[in-house]
Curated annotation (Swiss-Prot):
The keyword Hydrolase applies. Nucleotidase that shows phosphatase activity on nucleoside 5'-monophosphates. It comes from Synechococcus sp. (strain CC9902). It holds the Pfam family SurE. It comes from the Bacteria. This is 5'-nucleotidase SurE. The lineage of its organism: Bacteria, Bacillati, Cyanobacteriota, Cyanophyceae, Synechococcales. It catalyses: a ribonucleoside 5'-phosphate + H2O = a ribonucleoside + phosphate. InterPro entries: SurE, SurE-like_Pase/nucleotidase, SurE-like_sf. Gene3D superfamilies: Survival protein SurE-like phosphatase/nucleotidase (3.40.1210.10). GO terms for molecular function: 3'-nucleotidase activity; 5'-nucleotidase activity; exopolyphosphatase activity; metal ion binding; nucleotide binding. Its cofactor is a divalent metal cation.
Length: 269
């Protein structure tokens, strides 16, 4: 295989073990690797951008494997990708990788994931992009996740991988030896019991910590292969999940399923 130009980011920051393992795995296969990632933890920032303050970037090659070019950026994961693609990287990447996230990115949680947002920036620019997450905060199979991410992306990029499709890979919290087979999956719909812990600062003013817990995982009902398991169900079976995601959120159901609206004596149709 000819070497690929690979751009890597994450939302856990430049010091995270996951991104360093992924970058090392890509470099070990002979690819040209550039890392542009946040200089600190930026989890759950979604696709947010920094517009009210400057974005700074500093070289961080010493934190990564030999041959990896790295930048630590003061912005969000989406900022990092934009800065990389339009300012820091000389040549357009062949592949964008985001991760390895310290924790799962399953179901509709992808909407708040900085890891998925970084990969989505690549997808929006017409670059094949894959997000990869270790589906546990304690058990982190980073090497196994990195190897699988590279196997999947190297094969997919030479296969039928549409430009507008992001691949979201989650690795189960188990040893590689007992891990089941990889399958294509659907996004589940995650429902939370949103809880806030209210406290007082030394001046008596209230502040809050968000501490929601998942209470339900529902099967999605959209178009697509009906025999695919949900990503959550796949992880519960100790099997890796691979979910295709596209940036087009447009609803494609029948017109009759939409709310009937009438404004100024005219029906909306």
């Amino acid at each position: 295989m000819a070497p690929l130009r690979i751009l890597i980011s994450n939302d856990d920051g430049v010091f995270a073990d996951g991104i360093r393992t992924l970058a090392a795995a890509a470099a070990a296969r002979g690819h040209e690797v550039t890392v542009v990632c946040p200089d600190q933890e930026r989890s759950a920032t979604g696709h947010g951008l920094t517009l009210q303050s400057p974005i700074r970037a500093e070289r961080a090659d010493e934190l990564f494997a030999p041959g990896v070019t790295a930048w630590a950026c003061s912005g969000t994961p989406a900022d990092c990708m934009k800065l990389a693609l339009f300012e820091l990287v000389k040549h357009k990447p062949d592949l964008v990788l985001s991760g390895i996230n310290h924790g799962p990115n399953l179901g509709t949680d992808v909407f708040c994931s900085g890891t998925v947002a970084a990969a989505m920036e690549g997808t929006l620019e017409g670059i094949r992009s894959l997000a990869v997450s270790s589906a546990c905060f304690q058990w982190r199979q980073f090497q196994a996740a990195a190897d699988l991410a590279m196997d999947v992306s190297e094969q997919a990029i030479h296969g039928n991988w549409p430009e507008n499709m992001l691949l979201n890979l989650n690795i189960p919290p188990c040893a590689k030896e007992v891990m089941g087979p990889l399958r294509w999956t659907r996004l589940s719909i995650r429902r939370y019991d949103e809880q806030f812990s209210s406290r007082k600062d030394p001046r008596g003013r209230a502040y809050y910590w968000l501490a929601g817990e998942v209470v339900n995982d529902l099967e999605s009902a959209g178009e697509g292969p009906k025999d695919w398991p949900s990503d959550v169900a796949q992880i519960h079976k100790n099997c890796p999940s691979l979910t295709p995601i596209q940036p087009d959120l447009f609803w494609r159901g029948p017109l009759g399923d939409l709310p009937q609206l009438k404004l100024n004596d005219q029906s909306v149709h």
